[in-house]
């Protein structure tokens, strides 16, 4: 799974866990079907850099198998975009309050949050709903390991998220 998709999936899961209907893209044809706030989540501008020397962070021993693995990491800077829509302005505001709590304190440890900004609530003619847009500046940390013997690499995974 690519890094931007992992960030988006983590944010979607956190918002859903807090009771907000959340999806990757807002389905305009279903806009009126939601009784409360619904969030569309995206990952905006992103840039990356290595963590450690050429991504290398050192060796670790697997506590179960005692196999030594090399650990690599990378860091991605980006913007998480959230668009909240609701039939009522009050629902949009409540959704924004809940989303703020989640975005600033309920994401996996691999997503380090920065500044969160929200636009004012406005009326969106195309959907006939109230809309509030937010942007969260963040950096995300990804880790991968390789077995020293085989040199095989696993995919980079967002720190703090269980692998499937």
Predicted regions and their residues:
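Small/polar-rich, solvent-exposed N-terminal microdomains that initiate assembly or binding
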Residues: 1-62, 158, 162-164
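Hydrophobic beta-strand residues in large extracellular and virion-surface proteins
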Residues: 11, 15, 22, 41, ...
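Short structured motifs
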Residues: 26-27, 65-66, 117-122
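C-terminal basic regulatory modules in eukaryotic proteins
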Residues: 60, 64-80, 157-164
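Oligomerization/assembly interface segments of phage tail-like spikes and tubes
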Residues: 70-90, 129-142
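Acidic-leaning, charged glycine-interspersed low-complexity segments
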Residues: 92-149
């Amino acid at each position: 799974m690519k890094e931007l998709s992992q960030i988006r999936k983590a944010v979607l899961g956190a918002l859903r866990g807090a009771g907000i209907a959340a999806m990757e893209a807002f389905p305009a044809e279903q806009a009126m079907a939601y009784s409360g706030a619904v969030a569309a989540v995206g990952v905006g501008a992103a840039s990356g850099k290595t963590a450690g020397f050429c991504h290398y962070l050192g060796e670790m021993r697997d506590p179960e198998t005692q196999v030594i693995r090399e650990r690599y990491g990378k860091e991605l800077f980006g913007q998480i975009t959230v668009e909240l829509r609701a039939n009522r302005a009050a629902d949009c505001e409540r959704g924004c309050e809940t989303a703020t709590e989640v975005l600033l304190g309920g994401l996996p440890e691999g997503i380090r949050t920065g500044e969160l900004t929200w636009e004012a609530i406005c009326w969106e003619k195309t959907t006939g709903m109230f809309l509030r847009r937010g942007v969260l500046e963040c950096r995300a940390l990804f880790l991968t390991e390789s077995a020293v013997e085989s040199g095989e690499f696993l995919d980079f995974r967002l720190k703090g998220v269980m692998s499937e």
